[in-house]
Amino acid sequence: MTGRSIIVMGVCGCGKSTIGENIANTLNAKFIDGDDLHPKANIQKMASGTPLDDIDRAPWLERIRDAAYSIETKNETGVIVCSALKKKYRDQIREGNQNVQFIFLDGSKSLILERMRARQGHFMRETMLDSQLETLERPEQEPSVFTISIDGSIDSIVDAAVTVLVGNINE
């Protein structure tokens, strides 16, 4: 079996880190939080309430792509969480990688805002949600992208994601 990278994607506050870590635990996979791969300047910019632009995101997306490549070349399974909001970002992550799958965590703005208000100590302010929703290019009809609703418990979301991933190992 070849390595496989699973990218858990969506806007801020949709539960990427929580769901991604649980998927990784369930699949006995490596977990990488994409927030940890941001250059310090990006985190400072977002913490100040300023959205990132494509120039800001470029080195971060390279790090995500390289992490996926490392996982695949080691014949491991890994879960990486990152927003991957635009198709061109997802294509950049796919570049040079043979086995990348995306889990798109999809939910209403009101549900995401509710969850953002409940979390503590995250650099991303809830005011950034509108910017991310405007930037989001929904991954409809893209290969190896599976949309999972975030309406429901963490366990039900993880179960839905794992079910679709296990059923599509060689896609």
Q: Which residues make up each language-model segment?
A:
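Walker A (P-loop) ATP-phosphate-binding motif of ABC ATPase nucleotide-binding domains
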Residues: 5
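P-loop (Walker A) phosphate-binding loop of NTP-binding proteins
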Residues: 11
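Loop/turn-to-beta-strand initiation segments
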Residues: 74-78, 101
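Conserved substrate/cofactor phosphate-moiety recognition/catalytic segment
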Residues: 21-65
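Small-molecule kinase domains that catalyze NTP-dependent phosphoryl transfer to phosphate-bearing small molecules
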Residues: 118-160
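Hydrophobic anchor at the beta1->P-loop junction of P-loop NTPases
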Residues: 8
